[in-house]
């Protein structure tokens, strides 16, 4: 009887551990929105290290003004060029649509890039999708897609 109780206790511990591992990396909507807000703050302040660190090591950026980029180094190079624009900022135009996908969160919506070119303000309305996933307790953008909206 005592051995049986130990076996049940051991099985319970294993199941509890497996459930913890499965759900501990689940991203909440609040965490994903926090990453979105942090991304905007880093973008508006041209904080290169901050914005690059919003992405996972192997993050993918399908950029508005360039190519498909994979990894932080490629993403960094993209933002180095983009951050050269004067009066650069981004504004979210709506509340993001939220979808949970296997522990990750996808946020989609519209934003507008603003910058000065030849002394004239330019505004580029674009669509976005951010997929956020938690790794080792931190939420990262694993994929971002951005394209000009007509």
Residue ranges, per PLM feature:
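Hydrophobic alpha-helical topogenic segments used for membrane insertion/localization
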Residues: 3-22
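A beta-strand edge to alpha-helix "cap/lid" segment located at domain peripheries
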Residues: 8, 23-35, 40-50, 60-150
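Helix-to-beta-strand junctions that scaffold the AdoMet/dcAdoMet cofactor pocket
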Residues: 56
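Disulfide-bonded cysteine motifs in exported proteins
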Residues: 1-4, 27
């Amino acid at each position: 009887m005592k051995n049986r109780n130990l076996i049940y206790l051991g099985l319970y511990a294993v199941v509890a551990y497996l459930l913890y591992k499965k759900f501990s990396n689940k991203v909440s909507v609040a965490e994903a929105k926090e990453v979105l807000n942090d991304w905007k703050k880093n973008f508006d302040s041209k904080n290169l290290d901050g914005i690059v660190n919003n992405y996972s090591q192997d993050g993918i950026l399908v950029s508005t003004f360039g190519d498909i980029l994979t990894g932080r180094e490629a993403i960094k190079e993209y933002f180095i060029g983009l951050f050269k624009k004067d009066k650069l900022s981004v504004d979210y135009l709506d509340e993001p649509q939220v979808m949970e996908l296997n522990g990750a969160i996808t946020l989609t919506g519209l934003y507008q890039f603003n910058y000065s070119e030849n002394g004239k303000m330019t505004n580029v309305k674009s669509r976005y999708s951010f997929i956020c996933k938690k790794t080792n307790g931190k939420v990262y953008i694993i994929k971002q897609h951005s394209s000009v909206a007509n």
